[in-house]
Amino acid sequence: MGIVFLRNGSPYVYEAIKTVQYTPFRKWADRGEGGHYVVRRLREADRTLTSQAVKKLRQAGAKFQGKPYDSSFEWSDKRIYCSELVWKIYDRGLGIRVGELQKVRALDLSDPIVKTKMKERYGNKVLLEETVISPGEMFSSDLLVTVIQK
């Protein structure tokens, strides 16, 4: 997950992977399972995403450039995970909250794969009251529409 910005006329995905960085869109898309990817954009983007608005989004995002990836999903600015990056850029840049923040406790943690991953990351000290934004929560936001699906 990331946010697409044009750089010198070419699309790049600003994303949190090892660090927060720009990835050429094609390289990002090629990482999709079986080449699958989806691009969603704000509804009425032609009206909402003016050049001034995009400038504000870039400025909000610049504060995260180079920050390390947050594999423990803490709600802070020291380290950043993918959906947290995009959520904070929209919130801080334009005051738009794409998706509802949740507590870890509200997520479905019953899947065996999720349980194993949680145990690896947190041991027996899962921070159930930690604020999070999940990619699924953002993806399903009514504020977004699908513009590309491959």
Regions found by a protein language model. Give the residues of each.
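Cysteine-nucleophile amide-bond enzymes
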Residues: 1-150
